[in-house]
Amino acid sequence: EQLAKACPKGVDIYYENVGGKVFDAVLPLLNTSARIPVCGLVSSYNATELPPGPDRLPLLMATVLKKRIRLQGFIIAQDYGHRIHEFQKEMGQWVKEDKIHYREEITDGLENAPQTFIGLLKGKNFGKVVIRVAGDD
């Protein structure tokens, strides 16, 4: 409901990096000719079996067909790794110019890294996750 209120005109581009319930919430909001670049499915990285419930593939395929949605997977390192230096230069400049904003969740101590990583896979954070192993002194 909140997503539908936030996107009253629907969704034209959905960058898929999570999958699962997030994708389920976005699917009915996709507009005709929407585009979905798929870079990851973090919600299912630890899955050892199919999720419970009905098979949702027919709904996905019907939606892709009826709305003429373009769905394309890509792996950044393989597809764009050759442009890493260009990216670092441009992104670094944009961050300096305050054109790019991001959230950081900092956890102190290497001993907390395993639990923080598990939380990342379960969607318990928002933004960039950092493990601080030493102070800034």
Which role does the model predict for each range below?
Residues 1-137:
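Terminal helix/beta-alpha structural elements that buttress the NAD(P)+-binding lobe
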